[in-house]
């Protein structure tokens, strides 16, 4: 059994443990994923591969991650499309921006993408989002069309705490988001 653990407690301009793609960058202790313009894509990836699947045994590892984020938009009605925490092959490249959140190119299921994402979706896309039109947190498997969603009441400018956990024995991925203040 192998354990991988790391902690990124501060961001800075010389961030060695992250790979930035597209518009992603760090400055002033902040990670910024996109510019304030339409259809941009920015990503930050951990620089060392993390093995969660053993190709010899087929076993999948449990994992837990936690992070804090703030969406600080000029107004609470126009906050772009959102962002994702995702797990993908190490050679993954940025995909289509906008509603595809830089992770997918199509709403159709694609088993070759080998991607699992938790989306924090702030914009209703009629082609694949839940019909209620709410902002939501979704679990995506090889497609931007979520296999499970829960409505999310975004608190613009407020710090949110997230915990994402996968239990390999039950094959269940859970997501928790709280606003501490």
From Swiss-Prot:
Keywords: Calcium, Lectin, Manganese, Mannose-binding, Metal-binding. Ca(2+) binds at residues 121, 123, 125, 129. Pfam families: Lectin_legB. This is Lectin beta-1 and beta-2 chains. Mn(2+) binds at residues 119, 121, 129, 136. It comes from Lathyrus ochrus. Tetramer of two alpha and two beta chains. The keyword GTP-binding does not apply. Transmembrane segments: none annotated. The keyword Cell membrane does not apply. Binds one manganese (or another transition metal) ion and one calcium ion. The metal ions are essential for the saccharide-binding and cell-agglutinating activities. The sequence shown is that of the beta-1. SUPFAM superfamilies: Concanavalin A-like lectins/glucanases. GO terms for molecular function: D-mannose binding; metal ion binding. Belongs to the leguminous lectin family. InterPro entries: ConA-like_dom_sf, Lectin_legB_Mn/Ca_BS, Legume_lectin_dom, Leguminous_Lectin.
């Amino acid at each position: 059994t192998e354990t991988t653990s790391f902690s990124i407690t501060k961001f800075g301009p010389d961030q060695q443990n992250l790979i930035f793609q597209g518009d992603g960058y760090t400055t002033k202790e902040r990670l910024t994923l996109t510019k304030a313009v339409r259809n941009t894509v920015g990503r930050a990836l951990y620089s060392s591969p993390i093995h969660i699947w053993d190709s010899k045994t087929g076993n999948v590892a449990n994992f837990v991650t936690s992070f804090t984020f703030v969406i600080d938009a000029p107004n609470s009605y126009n906050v772009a499309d959102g962002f994702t925490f995702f797990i993908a092959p190490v050679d993954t490249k940025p995909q289509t921006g906008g509603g595809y959140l830089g992770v997918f190119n199509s709403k159709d299921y694609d088993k070759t993408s080998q991607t699992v994402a938790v989306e924090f979706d702030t914009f209703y896309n009629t082609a694949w989002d839940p019909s209620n039109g709410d902002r939501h947190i979704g679990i995506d498997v090889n497609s931007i069309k979520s296999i499970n969603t829960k409505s999310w009441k975004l608190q613009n400018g407020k710090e949110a705490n997230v915990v994402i956990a996968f239990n390999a024995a039950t094959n269940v991925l859970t997501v928790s988001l709280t606003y501490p203040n």
